[in-house]
């Protein structure tokens, strides 16, 4: 049983890597072939590694882990926010602020300021302040919410971090590694996998691919918290979705 089937991965375009000239040689073992200048990710490995990631995240959630979803590229922002929220976890889906983890005390002060501004509005303080001052406070709140709203209620530094595109999120990954926080990530063919604890080889530029993987890890959290099996497993159709079929799909899409 696989938590994500080969068919689902194919339909979401998870197999499409980057142009061969943009590859990172460290990802060679996760690449099946090359077609028309594009690397094709070995989805048989993706299926297995997605299972490992699912189990790891599920078990962490069962032990009340705090899990942070990170994906600031436009293709990932919506899925990261939606799925982290659905799983009752936390997210950063705009620019990563340097020191978010390694300088957590300072970040907490900014979060406290965000909560203070919200409280001022709720208590009616805005009603007695000059309009210009209220406008400045609203501008400050909007900026704080944009960058910190997803971790506003995060009780502590996360126990696990899930990353979409560690090539883009290098600062976040380095901070996690410095603090010994395990990193699960969607890793495309252009990224360095060395600092990733659990690699999910995948196209991190397609919205459908990001949504599929991210939603599955949210399912893992929900299952872990509920302590029961969710209906998330699928039988892989090894005949209809063999590795040879992947090549045919790629050739067809790139014809």
Curated annotation (Swiss-Prot):
Entry GO terms, CC: cytosolic small ribosomal subunit
The UniProt record lists the keyword Ribonucleoprotein: yes
Gene3D superfamilies the record matches: Glucose-6-phosphate isomerase like protein, domain 1, Helix hairpin bin
Keywords: Ribonucleoprotein, Ribosomal protein
InterPro entries: Ribosomal_uS2, Ribosomal_uS2_bac/mit/plastid, Ribosomal_uS2_CS, Ribosomal_uS2_flav_dom_sf
An example Gene Ontology molecular-function term: structural constituent of ribosome
Keyword Ribonucleoprotein: yes
Origin: domain of life: Bacteria
Family assignment from sequence similarity: Belongs to the universal ribosomal protein uS2 family.
Protein name: Small ribosomal subunit protein uS2
Natural source organism: Streptococcus pyogenes serotype M6 (strain ATCC BAA-946 / MGAS10394)
């Amino acid at each position: 049983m696989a938590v994500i089937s080969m068919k689902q991965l194919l339909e979401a375009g998870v197999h499409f890597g980057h142009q061969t000239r943009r590859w990172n040689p460290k990802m060679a073992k996760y690449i099946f072939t090359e077609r028309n200048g594009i690397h094709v990710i070995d989805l048989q490995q993706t299926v297995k590694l997605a299972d490992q990631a699912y189990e790891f995240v599920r078990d962490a959630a069962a032990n009340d882990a705090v899990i942070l979803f990170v994906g600031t590229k436009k293709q990932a922002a919506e899925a990261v926010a939606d799925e982290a929220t659905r799983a009752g976890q936390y997210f950063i889906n705009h620019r990563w602020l340097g020191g978010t983890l390694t300088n957590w005390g300072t970040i907490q002060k900014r979060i406290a300021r965000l909560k203070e501004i919200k409280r001022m509005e709720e208590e009616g303080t805005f009603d007695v302040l000059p309009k210009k001052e209220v406008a400045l406070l609203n501008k400050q709140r909007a900026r704080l919410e944009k960058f910190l709203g997803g971790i506003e209620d995060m009780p502590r530094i996360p126990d696990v971090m899930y990353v979409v595109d560690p090539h883009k999120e290098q600062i976040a990954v380095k901070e996690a590694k410095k603090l010994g926080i395990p990193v699960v990530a969607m890793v495309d063919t252009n990224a360095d996998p060395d600092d990733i604890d659990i690699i999910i080889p995948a196209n991190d530029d397609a919205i459908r691919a990001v949504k599929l993987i991210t939603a599955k890890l949210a399912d893992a959290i929900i299952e872990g918290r509920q302590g029961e099996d969710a209906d998330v497993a699928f039988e892989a159709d090894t005949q209809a979705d063999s590795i040879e079929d992947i090549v045919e799909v790629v050739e067809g899409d790139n014809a």
